[in-house]
Amino acid sequence: MRGARGAWDFLCVLLLLLRVQTGSSQPSVSPGEPSPPSIHPGKSDLIVRVGDEIRLLCTDPGFVKWTFEILDETNENKQNEWITEKAEATNTGKYTCTNKHGLSNSIYVFVRDPAKLFLVDRSLYGKEDNDTLVRCPLTDPEVTNYSLKGCQGKPLPKDLRFIPDPKAGIMIKSVKRAYHRLCLHCSVDQEGKSVLSEKFILKVRPAFKAVPVVSVSKASYLLREGEEFTVTCTIKDVSSSVYSTWKRENSQTKLQEKYNSWHHGDFNYERQATLTISSARVNDSGVFMCYANNTFGSANVTTTLEVVDKGFINIFPMINTTVFVNDGENVDLIVEYEAFPKPEHQQWIYMNRTFTDKWEDYPKSENESNIRYVSELHLTRLKGTEGGTYTFLVSNSDVNAAIAFNVYVNTKPEILTYDRLVNGMLQCVAAGFPEPTIDWYFCPGTEQRCSASVLPVDVQTLNSSGPPFGKLVVQSSIDSSAFKHNGTVECKAYNDVGKTSAYFNFAFKGNNKEQIHPHTLFTPLLIGFVIVAGMMCIIVMILTYKYLQKPMYEVQWKVVEEINGNNYVYIDPTQLPYDHKWEFPRNRLSFGKTLGAGAFGKVVEATAYGLIKSDAAMTVAVKMLKPSAHLTEREALMSELKVLSYLGNHMNIVNLLGACTIGGPTLVITEYCCYGDLLNFLRRKRDSFICSKQEDHAEAALYKNLLHSKESSCSDSTNEYMDMKPGVSYVVPTKADKRRSVRIGSYIERDVTPAIMEDDELALDLEDLLSFSYQVAKGMAFLASKNCIHRDLAARNILLTHGRITKICDFGLARDIKNDSNYVVKGNARLPVKWMAPESIFNCVYTFESDVWSYGIFLWELFSLGSSPYPGMPVDSKFYKMIKEGFRMLSPEHAPAEMYDIMKTCWDADPLKRPTFKQIVQLIEKQISESTNHIYSNLANCSPNRQKPVVDHSVRINSVGSTASSSQPLLVHDDV
């Protein structure tokens, strides 16, 4: 081995001598000048296969050093010869030989490795608008199509330009900010196949193209000595290389500051520099600057610190502190004041009396550093006796301050005395402010006004000052001897505000003057005016009383906001929000026939175009006011609209579809129910009713006392039965009266659309009644879950539509309750007494439980096929007494025993023992057929707005008022 190595050394020396002699491998140099070393083999590039030997020889007369560079790696060898016995792909790179003179020569070696075509440095950073190198040099220079490709086949940005270099990599030209986080591969074609390198993620360092954005937490600070001064400067830029610092104006002192920073996305950097002086002193006052700069430029912002030894209050009147105002006019006393620390107490005082209202105090600016405030005292219709000193007092934790306004009320003169004759002198005393002037006038006979002055008759005037800020009193006297004839004397007092006169009549009898009397010309006219005015007031009061006694329209549905103790707190419907998404153009409504009308409004059938679809027509019901409606009714209709929008949609309530509140009277658009109200539907179907149970009920007795005997049967005969007269209008029909008709379809065959058959043509059976009971209970459970009390649940307020779907509604203004015998006058309201719970009748209590009572009455209506409850019994004292004593109606003819049991529980005297609507739903579910339940479930699931799960009363109440429980006593509500 040593022999071979020696032979190789000898050969190298020989070659070196030959090269020196011939000088063919190096450029000619001048004698004495050093020359660069030479490398063997004498090529610029050398290609070897992986596993082969790399042998490089550097020849130079003196000392040489080898350097190998690839990517960021550098290796050195101080031998003349560089030998790598088994070449690897990582040995690809530039080999440089340097002599002692610093002259060098290089050769680039490619180690061809088909399994590793790229030498990859995956760190890839680029500065915006500069070139950046993707370092993926090749190990085989003979591959083709050396380029860049996007990851996962994504195309490269259209404006991306690059230059490939097999020895260095691929240079991306003029990097853009949009290239940030761009995923790349280096790519070549080898033997017809595309080969990709490992992926690169390009991270772009943005270039500064604007100065930093700098802001401070406050522009100025005012502190007392010893308080902490803390100010935060926020610097925003595209990268964290922005520089920032706090500086004090005219000072080189290093300030203590803390930094917090974070990135908001890729090119949004934010830094907060907080400057703190733990205990500020007066000499710390000054201007502090937050300075920031980047390569583009600099920006700064300042904040001012003022430190005072203690707090202060400075008051500045906005008007003159001496104020003159005429009697009956208004005046505003306004001050501005600076207060530091913040004011704690402010008040206006007059005559040792503190104003509790009529004034307001507010900061002049919403700026956090504001110390200036405004206080205004509003004096309205000042009287002559209300002049005086009005004082504003303000204080904070350090000082007190006050300012006073002297208010003088200018008053028209008032003549106090004008009929006194003292020692032959006629006196006239007047008071007013400013001081009045008195003139005398005379005219013969009895006149309304005198114009001839008595001057130059001797007139004596005596001024006397009144109380401070009060009226000034002036007394004037005239010698009555100046008057030689019968006549009228006028005393006229005037000042800048106005004038007042008094008249005197006198006459001569012989040589003596008769006692002077006041002028009485206008007394009859004045008395007549007072009488007429009094009569007008009485008429207005009577009309107002009658108007207030007139039953007013109000929304029956009440939404409970919370329960406090024994009181329901209702949401004021006028305060509910109204979303204008419900607005519908008026010109897309075409009105038809009137469906119902009352004293205040009506419901009209209409066609709405484009309500659901842009090109579709839909039949709707529109509730509107009559032209005679008052403001109260207009507000009530708007409240009803807000309540409906608050409740949302449910299959068993009449849902809101839209509204028109702009550009005309309010219109409420709701679903149209083609079969009208359930009460009349039941009465129409009596003769076609198919009963699926025994019809042998006795009809002799309709009432019994359920208070003491809960389980009495129809056959019981006790003193608790009442002898009742037949109903005036409708009574329970007997079996003999009925004419049965054959049903042409079953419930399960119906569809919600009228395409197959009209539901009104079908007969009515017990399954229908159970379905109606179930649906109304579901609807009431939904209202209860929304904390809504109905207050007028009855068959007349249930509508029926396709598929015999029931919908709960409130006719409200569209019902003529004045002519409806179901509504009885009680106080100044008409109430559906026979449907009301005892607590509602006697205590004006409306609760969720009182709705349950009404539901029991509704069930009686339903299973009696539309008969009036308590038939033949008028609402009088006897009725009220029997309700109190526990008398309840017997089961209607067509009610199953289970349904009558539900009615009895709904009529429990103790409201808290009545079932909730959720429990009622569960009870009825056990009785309806599977087909009916299945159909209802399908309809509910197909509804565009499925209702939320219904909650129980106790859960609902606890969710509304935290202090309530399911066992709470009756809750009193005064709003009937």
Curated annotation (Swiss-Prot):
Biological processes annotated in GO: actin cytoskeleton organization; B cell differentiation; cell chemotaxis; cell migration; cytokine-mediated signaling pathway; detection of mechanical stimulus involved in sensory perception of sound; digestive tract development; ectopic germ cell programmed cell death
Keywords: ATP-binding, Cell membrane, Cytoplasm, Disease variant, Disulfide bond, Glycoprotein, Immunoglobulin domain, Kinase, Magnesium, Membrane, Metal-binding, Nucleotide-binding, Phosphoprotein, Proto-oncogene, Receptor, Repeat, Signal, Transferase, Transmembrane, Transmembrane helix, Tyrosine-protein kinase, Ubl conjugation
Extracellular side: 26-524
Consequence recorded when altering residue 737 to N: In a colorectal adenocarcinoma sample; somatic mutation
Disulfide bonds: 58-97, 136-186, 151-183, 233-290, 428-491
Entries under CDD domains matching the protein: Ig, IgI_4_SCFR, PTKc_Kit
Glycosylation sites: 130, 145, 283, 293, 300, 320, 352, 367, 463, 486
Domain Protein kinase, residue spans: 589-937
Activity control: Present in an inactive conformation in the absence of bound ligand. KITLG/SCF binding leads to dimerization and activation by autophosphorylation on tyrosine residues. Activity is down-regulated by PRKCA-mediated phosphorylation on serine residues. Inhibited by imatinib/STI-571 (Gleevec) and sunitinib; these compounds maintain the kinase in an inactive conformation.
Active-site residues, record numbering mapped to chain: 792
Residue ranges constituting the Ig-like C2-type domain according to the UniProt record: 27-112, 121-205, 212-308, 317-410, 413-507
Any single GO CC term annotated in Swiss-Prot or TrEMBL for this entry: cell-cell junction
Site (Important for interaction with phosphotyrosine-binding proteins): 936
Induction, per UniProt: Up-regulated by cis-retinoic acid in neuroblastoma cell lines.
Quaternary organization: Monomer in the absence of bound KITLG/SCF. Homodimer in the presence of bound KITLG/SCF, forming a heterotetramer with two KITLG/SCF molecules. Interacts (via phosphorylated tyrosine residues) with the adapter proteins GRB2 and GRB7 (via SH2 domain), and SH2B2/APS. Interacts (via C-terminus) with MPDZ (via the tenth PDZ domain). Interacts (via phosphorylated tyrosine residues) with PIK3R1 and PIK3 catalytic subunit. Interacts (via phosphorylated tyrosine) with CRK (isoform Crk-II), FYN, SHC1 and MATK/CHK (via SH2 domain). Interacts with LYN and FES/FPS.
Role description: Tyrosine-protein kinase that acts as a cell-surface receptor for the cytokine KITLG/SCF and plays an essential role in the regulation of cell survival and proliferation, hematopoiesis, stem cell maintenance, gametogenesis, mast cell development, migration and function, and in melanogenesis. In response to KITLG/SCF binding, KIT can activate several signaling pathways. Phosphorylates PIK3R1, PLCG1, SH2B2/APS and CBL. Activates the AKT1 signaling pathway by phosphorylation of PIK3R1, the regulatory subunit of phosphatidylinositol 3-kinase.
Protein name: Mast/stem cell growth factor receptor Kit
Lineage of the species this protein comes from: Eukaryota, Metazoa, Chordata, Craniata, Vertebrata
